[in-house]
Amino acid sequence: MKNSPKLLNLMNIKEKLTKYLDLIKSLEHPMHQDDILKFMYLLKRDRLSSGPYPKVSLFEAANRIFSDLVIWLGVKQLLNDRMVDNTRLPFTEYKVRFSVRAGHDLEADSGTVHLIGEAFHVAPSLYKKKLADTVKKLQDKNADYKLIIFNSDALENHDRDPEKSNPSMLYLPVYVPKTLNEISNLI
């Protein structure tokens, strides 16, 4: 998937998310092997030729796709309801970047007010470390709002309320369905 920024708003998010889901549906993946070790090797090393991330392994594509879904569904949630805890955000569109290695996953501007954000999809066992790393990445940046969007099931075995949000650091847990049908029903 190209790393160029996408501008998402209420007028285009459904269409763009539907196209992204179609890319996921087009993904060809290795079938189960009789040898479990061979299957795991293919999962981690065999390059895909389709989907949003061709030329990476299914394992890597899965990591990227689920992080992308956190961004898509988080921005959709923000566009439909601008409240994050007790903070109302003034933004009507968000600039997002998928599979970002440098910079931020999302940004928004509304006149003189600026937001930067990061998003991730992580297992519950890695949640605290990933959250701490993300807070550290954002804390010294210059923005009116800093936002962290993450998969809500990462909170399993942790406090259901990760941190208390305030404008200097907002936390948005997002439910990410496990099937394409469930996601399609959300949009």
Annotate each PLM feature.
Residues 1-47:
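Nuclease-adjacent, charged terminal/linker segments that flank catalytic cores
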Residues 28, 62-63, 77, 147-171, ...:
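Metal-dependent nuclease catalytic core centered on acidic motifs
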Residues 47-95:
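Acidic-basic catalytic patches of nuclease active cores, encompassing PD-(D/E)XK
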Residues 65-69, 73, 101, 129-133:
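Short, well-structured alpha-helical interface segments that form or flank functional binding sites
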Residues 96-100:
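A short beta-turn/loop motif at secondary-structure boundaries
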Residues 104-117:
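Active-site beta-strand-loop-beta-strand hairpin of nuclease catalytic cores
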Residues 119-173:
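Catalytic cores of nucleic-acid endonucleases
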